[in-house]
């Protein structure tokens, strides 16, 4: 961005947070240059025609997924209406903070309906839609809009009046076009770099999972003689390993919560940690249990917790003492089971697939239960070998995680650079007229 110079002459915008703007730029409220949530009365006679349908989860930054179709009459009431070239922007948390905004294009019959949590902005002759699209990604606009959100928890929304009355600055249409052309080029370049880094990060994560799965089911000695485990999900194991029922290694802890137990959160991302710590790490509040507290289950450090309703992420290791919902099964390791080894095994792709297979024939609406866990046999190296494998994985996983963290940091920096360039361009801090 250093190659771009400022405009030759600036003036005071009269808006404190905007400050100085190019002398020939104008100040306008968003509602002066656009229509917010346009009326759909013109569609009354075409209600039998098809249109695109857009759930909230299919709106992302600069992307909408157009794979759902409805008849207009089925979605006419109760959904947001939009057309090709309209700006679609999420108004609810966390979608707004995640910059879920795009311009509609390629809609069936040029028409779409979607979630009411999407605001639709249709520019008029005073503004080019892509210029306003970039303006709505400007950092200070987003900061102010987030600070004005109303509601509680996960239902906080940007008020409509923020979109209508917010003051922006803009040049004439020809200059807007020039700015947008350069923004399109530069953001596409940055997005391509981000895409490459994300693919590299996914490869690292795949390598991490493959390493874990191989180590916990095949060991670390590539020359060891193998045998058939007799268990489909495990396959071959070293000849000296055992394969035993889960109950030989783990027992269900049925202890009720203690009076002084802290509430724990069983998460795929962090394991089983205090609820307060989870809220701190995620920087958000989550619902706290207030009913049936006497039915909660006690958890000790290094116990395992299995969600009967959501087991796709495997079984989580307890990293603190406390209590969890009665909807969980709590497992205590017996003598001869190295907790860290089984922590890796229980999060491996093969074991998770085994749980899914075990639960495949469970009638819809029922949960996985302890009996289903018991069905899965487990590999059993010696305790010494379990410890050796877990120490090896601790080192290798930490190394891969450090690489992933570096890639994530570089992606965050690229995203910051993208936002900074957009902000500088749409507020007139840099002059893009010379290309």
Pin down the residues of each PLM region.
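Ligand-binding loop in jelly-roll beta-barrel domains
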Residues: 122-128, 333-338
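Amphipathic alpha-helical coiled-coil/heptad-repeat segments
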Residues: 1-18, 24, 170-224, 380-435
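Sequence-specific dsDNA recognition surfaces
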Residues: 11-14, 31-43, 52-87, 247-259, ...
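Short, ligand-facing micro-motifs at secondary-structure edges
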Residues: 52-68, 87-114, 130-134, 143-148, ...
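Interdomain signal-transducing alpha-helices
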Residues: 132, 176-179, 342, 346, ...
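A short glycine-rich beta-alpha junction/loop motif
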Residues: 10-13, 111-119, 150-177, 308-309, ...
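Non-catalytic DNA-recognition/assembly elements of restriction-modification systems
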Residues: 9-43, 165, 173, 177, ...
């Amino acid at each position: 961005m250093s190659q771009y110079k400022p405009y030759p002459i600036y003036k005071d915008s009269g808006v404190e947070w905007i400050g100085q703007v190019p002398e020939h730029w104008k100040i306008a409220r968003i509602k002066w240059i656009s229509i917010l949530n346009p009326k759909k009365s013109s569609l009354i006679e075409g209600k039998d025609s098809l249109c695109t349908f857009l759930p909230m989860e299919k709106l992302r930054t600069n992307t909408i997924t157009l794979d759902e179709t409805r008849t207009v009459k089925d979605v006419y009431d109760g959904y947001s209406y939009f057309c090709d070239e309209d700006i679609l922007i999420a108004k609810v948390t966390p979608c707004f903070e995640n910059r879920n905004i795009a311009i509609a294009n390629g809609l069936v019959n040029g028409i779409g309906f979607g979630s009411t949590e999407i605001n639709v902005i249709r520019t008029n002759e005073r503004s080019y839609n892509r210029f306003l699209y970039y303006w709505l990604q400007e950092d200070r606009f987003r900061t102010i809009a987030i600070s004005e959100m109303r509601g509680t928890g996960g239902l906080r929304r940007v008020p409509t009046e923020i979109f209508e009355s917010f003051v922006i600055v803009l040049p004439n249409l020809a200059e807007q076009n020039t700015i947008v052309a350069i923004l399109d080029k530069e953001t596409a370049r940055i997005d391509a770099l981000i895409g490459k880094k994300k693919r590299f990060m996914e490869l690292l994560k795949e390598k991490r999972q493959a390493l874990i799965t191989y180590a916990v089911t095949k060991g670390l000695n590539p020359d060891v003689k193998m045998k058939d485990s007799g268990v489909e999900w495990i396959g071959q194991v070293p000849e000296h390993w055992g394969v035993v029922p889960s109950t030989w290694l783990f027992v269900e802890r049925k202890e009720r919560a203690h009076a002084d137990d802290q509430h724990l959160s069983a998460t795929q991302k962090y394991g089983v940690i205090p609820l307060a710590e989870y809220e701190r790490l995620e920087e958000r509040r989550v619902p706290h249990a207030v009913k049936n507290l006497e039915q909660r289950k006690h958890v000790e450090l290094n116990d395992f917790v299995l969600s009967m309703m959501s087991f796709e992420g495997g079984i989580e290791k307890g990293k603190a003492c406390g209590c969890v919902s009665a909807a969980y099964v709590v497992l205590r390791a017996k003598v001869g089971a190295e907790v860290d080894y089984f922590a890796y095994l229980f999060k491996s792709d093969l074991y998770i697939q085994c749980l899914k297979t075990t639960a495949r024939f469970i009638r819809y609406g029922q949960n996985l239960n302890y009996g289903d866990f018991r069905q899965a046999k487990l590999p059993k190296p010696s305790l010494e070998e379990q410890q050796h494998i877990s120490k090896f994985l601790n080192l290798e996983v930490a190394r891969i995680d450090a690489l992933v963290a570096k890639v994530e940091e570089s992606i965050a920096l690229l995203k910051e650079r993208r936002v900074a360039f957009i902000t500088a361009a749409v507020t007139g801090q840099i002059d893009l007229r010379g290309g």
